[in-house]
A protein has these predicted regions:
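Short, surface-exposed amphipathic charged segments that create phosphate/polyanion-binding patches used
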Residues: 62-64, 80-85, 149-155, 178-183, ...
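Short acidic/polar capping segments at secondary-structure boundaries
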Residues: 121-123, 141-143, 171-172, 194-198, ...
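A conserved helix-loop-beta module that forms one wall/lid of the active-site cleft
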Residues: 129-201
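ATP-dependent carboxylate activation and anion-phosphoryl transfer catalytic cores
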Residues: 255-261, 274-474
Length: 474
């Protein structure tokens, strides 16, 4: 397995290119960006996607695959192997890749500038040190600081309603603090490290065993907060251009399993308009604070609504959210033709510190909303795939069909890894997007898609995975 697992890009001499560097699930965002850049620059633009996703086949144009972790495991076990790679590790590998560096140099012989577009800005991305290369997104230094949950809770108390919290340095301090708080925070204690997403490095604890089984080392600084029983986990997607201009795309409801594990979202939110309006207002305030800190671009805010209908801040994600592509597809159908979509708004925020004059924000509780939901099937343990899932269609096209009422319900399965792969725990087997005329039809589509995905996992996957692991030791 070479440094580049797969590539199929072809350079058109009459086209300018930017690079997308990130996971394949956000590939579709770049189509919106290339359309905007083509129009704004009055010349054809396209993109080349550098992704870490190891799949059996790629029904995507202009892709190059680099995954240093999968490459190392493939060399050890001599089997097709797929795994997620941490963002910093991936960005570092891409930044040092001779293949990518040569690609950029080749592009710079034909165009004056190469943009790099990412899902999240990482400090490990250093390709913009090259002359003529720039990041089309937030500053990585600023994003890293703002994504620190401890920094958020300590510095955003005057901006958003933050739960009661404490900061603990090391396991001993964590144990001492929680011993005092168990009798007071009787519904549980949420424990997380400074950087955690989708349930990793976090736990809702009701005793010390819950914590010690999750965290094996004392090297972390921990944030603990009072857990509040709640029914709703709304997430708000937005773009900030400056300290007074924050665009809110809308509110979706997150699906949280096991108390802290994010598996997808549904839209439109079931929350009443007055609560959604409050979420809009809070998110604008958070966005203005982000701008004061130097952040420009797409971001998301997660909240909970407790049993007394009080809104509590959970976190801000100084990056694109998992719902960004779905919101682009939704807004394209609901807003007037020609208004800028989220990637174009981010472009103007980064380059010009403002939004274009024809920006149009959706109203709260927009009439005629498209119903959709997503489900990310992440594996809790190593597995083997013994089934094939063909490419199921274009997500953007499906939203168009739903908006024109050409279909009453539909779901697509995306990024299925493929047949005869060893898949590492923590990897996505695939992603489901369902559309319908109401929430019920969306849930039916998600359930059916999940069954189809799960059917591709080998029944004897535990034995198979153990055999493969044993071979790696031999």
């Amino acid at each position: 397995m070479s440094e580049v697992y797969f590539h199929n890009y072809r350079i058109d001499p009459d086209t300018r290119y930017f690079l997308y560097i990130g996971e394949l699930k956000n590939y579709g965002l770049n189509i919106f960006l290339k359309d905007a850049l083509s129009r704004l620059n009055n010349c054809p633009y396209d993109f080349i996607a550098i992704v870490p996703d190891i799949l059996e086949q790629y029904d995507y144009a202009n892709v190059a695959v680099i995954n240093p972790v999968a490459r190392e495991n493939f060399l050890n076990i001599k089997r097709k192997y797929s795994c997620r790679v941490p963002g910093p590790t991936f960005m570092q590998a891409v930044s040092k890749s001779p293949h990518v560096i040569k690609l950029i140099k080749d592009l710079l012989t034909r165009q004056a500038q190469v943009y790099i577009y990412m899902y999240e800005s990482y400090r490990e991305m250093t390709l913009d040190d090259m002359d003529g290369v720039s990041i089309l997104g937030p500053s990585s230094r600023v994003a890293n600081r703002l994504n620190n949950k401890i920094y958020q809770y300590e510095n955003f108390q005057d901006v958003a309603p933050i739960p009661e919290f404490k900061v603990c340095r090391g396991l001993d301090a964590l144990q001492a603090a929680t011993e005092e708080l168990w009798p007071v925070w009787t519904d549980g204690i949420f424990v997380t490290t400074a950087y955690s997403a989708a349930g990793t490095n976090s736990v809702i604890a009701h005793n010390w065993t819950d914590i010690s089984s999750k965290f094996k080392t004392g090297d972390y600084v921990y944030l603990i907060s009072r857990y509040r029983p709640h029914q709703y986990d709304p997430t708000v997607l937005a773009v900030v251009a400056n300290t007074s201009d924050v665009y809110v795309a809308g509110v979706a409801d997150q699906r949280i399993e096991g108390g802290n594990r994010f598996t997808g979202s549904t839209y439109p939110s079931v929350l009443p308009p007055e609560l959604q309006s409050e979420l809009y207002t809070l998110t604008r305030r958070v966005g203005c604070r982000l701008a004061e800190e130097g952040y420009r671009g797409i971001f998301g805010c997660d909240y909970i609504i407790d049993d007394q209908n009080r809104i509590l801040f959970v976190e801000v994600n100084a990056r694109k959210q998992g719902t960004t592509l779905e919101f682009c597809c939704t807004l394209e159908q609901l807003l007037p033709p020609g208004v800028p979509m989220l990637p174009e708004l981010e472009y103007h925020a980064v380059v010009a510190n403002r939004f274009p004059e024809n920006t149009r924000e959706p109203a709260v509780g927009l009439e005629g909303a498209i119903y959709w939901g997503t489900y990310n099937l992440k594996l809790a343990e190593d597995a083997c795939v013994a089934g094939f899932m063909p490419f199921c269609g274009d997500e953007r096209q499906c939203f168009g069909l739903a908006a024109r009422e050409k279909v009453s319900r539909q779901f697509v399965i995306l990024e299925h890894i493929g047949n005869d792969f060893v898949i590492a725990a923590g990897s996505f087997l695939g992603r489901i997007v369902a559309l319908g005329q109401d929430h019920r039809s969306v849930q039916q589509g998600l359930a059916q898609g999940k069954k189809m995905l799960e059917a591709t996992i080998a029944r004897s996957w535990q034995t198979t995975a153990q055999t493969v692991a044993a071979k790696a030791v031999e």
